UniProtKB/Swiss-Prot annotation:
Localisation: Plastid, Chloroplast inner membrane
Summary of the function given for this chain in its UniProt record: Contributes to K(+)/H(+) antiport activity by supporting proton efflux to control proton extrusion and homeostasis in chloroplasts in a light-dependent manner to modulate photosynthesis. Prevents excessive induction of non-photochemical quenching (NPQ) under continuous-light conditions. Indirectly promotes efficient inorganic carbon uptake into chloroplasts.
TM segment ranges: 138-158, 186-206, 221-241
GO-annotated molecular function: antiporter activity; proton transmembrane transporter activity
SS bond list: none
Signal peptide span: none
Catalyzed reactions per annotation: K(+)(in) + H(+)(out) = K(+)(out) + H(+)(in)
Membrane topology: Multi-pass membrane protein
Name of the molecule in the record: Potassium/proton antiporter CemA
Keywords: Antiport, Chloroplast, Hydrogen ion transport, Ion transport, Membrane, Plastid, Plastid inner membrane, Potassium, Potassium transport, Transmembrane, Transmembrane helix, Transport
Amino acid sequence: MDLIPRSIIRTLFRFWTELTSQSSSLAIHELEVAKYKTFASLQYLTCLIVLPWAISISLQNSLESWVTNWWNTGQSKKIFDYLQEENAIRKFEKIEELFLLEIMVKDYSETPSQDIRVEMQKKMIQLVKIYNQDCIHIISHLLANLIGLVLLSVCLILGKKKLGILNSWIQEVFYSLSDTMKAFSILLVTDLCIGFHSPHGWELMINWIFENYGFAHNERIISGLVSTFPVILDTIFKYWIFRRLNRISPSLVVIYHSMNE
């Protein structure tokens, strides 16, 4: 099906319409189809990006009150403690160290040890309140994101026709570029995702996901993901170049390798 490049097929089709004197009506029809594809694609793309994000943000505030009541029952904390236990212990240790440092800096020689324990308990109670609020925020944020993900899946399932139009429009825009611009676009995307400096971006993104979804910070898991994702993407991309681009446009592959060197 992909043995003959699309550009040759389009050229032969236009040449045939010129011979049959249907070029003017075909040009008007192609212009109308191009306008419809562009409008439908941009509308659907905006819907996919904005709608789940807007609904997720609007639901987060309303879900927070319900999550607060659910969290304060006490039974729910057992479900979430294993995710936040390390973070909580780390924060408790940090508060304890800061408080002991404050005792050493200030003159607490005349302060009874009982008063010091009371101050320590106040600090710990304050930290527990902050910990509970963080857990409530993480759970409400997680629920809102899951609802947004479900809505995005529904949009993709119900909008298969528009998704096909969007895919066709993106391919037409890409293939309408010159080989140099195609190679530049591919090189820009690949350098951002799998380039020399990409691990820093992957690390920031994975840390952000861990913090937003309430997972404890684990350097081994993060370093493993950072070292794995770019390799997988690089393999997929090389296969795509070998399987598809090398067959559709060999000149594009040559230009890409020249720019990459």
